[in-house]
Amino acid sequence: MVYKSIFPTFVQNINLGQMTESERKQIIALIQREVIPAIGCTEPIAVALCVAKATETLGAKPEKIKVLLSANILKNAMGVGIPGTGMIGLPIAVALGALIGKSDYQLEVLKDSTPEAVEEGKKLIDEKRICISLKEDITEKLYIEVTCEAGGEQATAIISGGHTTFVYVAKGDEVLLNKQQTSGEEEEEETLELTLRKVYDFALTAPLDEIRFILETARLNKKAAEQSFQGDYGHALGKMLRGTYEHKIMGDSVFSHILSYTSAACDARMAGGMIPVMSNSGSGNQGISATLPVVVYAEENGKSEEELIRALMMSHLTVIYIKQSLGRLSALCGCVVAATGSSCGITWLMGGSYKQVAFAVQNMIANLTGMICDGAKPSCALKVTTGVSTAVLSAVMAMENRCVTSVEGIIDEDVDQSIRNLTRIGSQGMNETDRVVLDIMTHKGC
C-alpha cells in the first residue's frame, strides 16, 4: 500500500518540551534492543542460541550437551514447532544449535538449517547425547545453562534475564564472561522509567526519521501472515477466518481482517515455519500482536505513513513499558500485554486523545487480566485472536468515552497504577498458577 505523505498537525494533548534529547535517545535505543527479528518461538531459539555459543567456545562439535533450564523456559519450549524441522520441542533445537547455529545471528540462530543438518540432529538425539533437565533452586524465570563436552574439554554458556543476554561464558577453567551478579540488560532498562503519558508523548513528538525504523515491523510481520495464508500451518486459524465463516458471521470487515492477519502470522510461527517475524521484548507473538492490528486498521482506513509509524511506535513502546514490570516470562499470557499496545495504537488512529488511549488500556486490563500462559504452541493463535479482538473492542469503547471505573475490580483511577496491578498479578500473584500449569503439562499421558 502507498501511504499519503502529508500529515496534519497533532499537537493537542501533548506535553511538548517535557522530554529531553537524552531521554528520547534512551527510548529509541530501548526500542531497538527490544524490537528485533526472530525465527521460531523465542524460548527454544534462545536455548539454541546458548548451545551455539557454548559450541563456539568449545571449538569442536560436542560429543555431549547438558542443558539446564528454568521452569518457564521449559514450559514455553515443550509443544512448539522448531523452524525448518517439522519437529516439536527442545531436543532438535539443541542439536541444531550445536550443528549449524551461529550466535551472531541472535534470535535467527537457526536460519542456516538444512534437511541434512536436521537428519544429523536426529542422530544426536537418538544417540542420547543431549540431556535436558530443570534447573533447581533458582528465582530467575528466564534461565538457560548449557555445557558442551568433546575430547575431554568442556565449555559453558549461560543466558539469564533476556533471551539474548549472556551472563556467563567459560572454557574449562577460563572464565571469558561473568555478569551473573548483575544483569546488565535489566539494569539498563531500570534507569529509564516510562509512564503511559511518556509513551504517548514520545510516539507523537519524536522526529520521524528517528523512528521510521519501526515500519520494518509492518513489513516483516505482514509478510509472515501472507505466507501463512498460502500454507497450512498449525490450526490454520488465520486462513480459516478468510473463508466462508468470516463472510457469513463477521463480514468482510476491518475487524475480521485484523483477526485473520494476526492469527495467521502466529499460526506459521508456532507451527515451526521458517518465517521471520519482528519480536517485542523477546516474543514473536507479542511483536505480531503489537503490529498487525495497527497495520491493518491503518491501511484499510487510508492513514498516512506518518500516522502508521507513530501508531506502531505507541503500540510497541506500550508493550515494552508494561513488560518492564511484568518480566520476560510469567504465568500471564503475553497477548494481554501486546494487545494492549495495539489497542492504544488503534485508539489513536481513530482520533483518540491521550485520555481515550488511557481508557483503552483500562478496558484491556479489566477484561483480559488472568489469562494463563500454558506454553508456546499452535493454539497460541487462539489466544492472540482473543487478545486483538478485545483490543478493538476496548478502542471502540474508549472512543465512546466508556471506561471501566476505579470501583471495579483491579482498575485504579491512575492508569499507570492499573498497569502495576496487572503486572503484580502476573509476576507475583500467579506464581502458584505457573507451578501448577507446568506440573499438569509434564504429567500428561501423551
Name each region found by the language model.
Residues 37-53, 275-292, 333-337:
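Conserved phosphate/anionic-ligand binding catalytic regions in large, soluble enzymes, centered on
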Residues 48-138, 144-145:
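Early transmembrane hairpin of solute transport permeases
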Residues 126-272, 437-446:
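Signature of multi-pass transmembrane helix bundles
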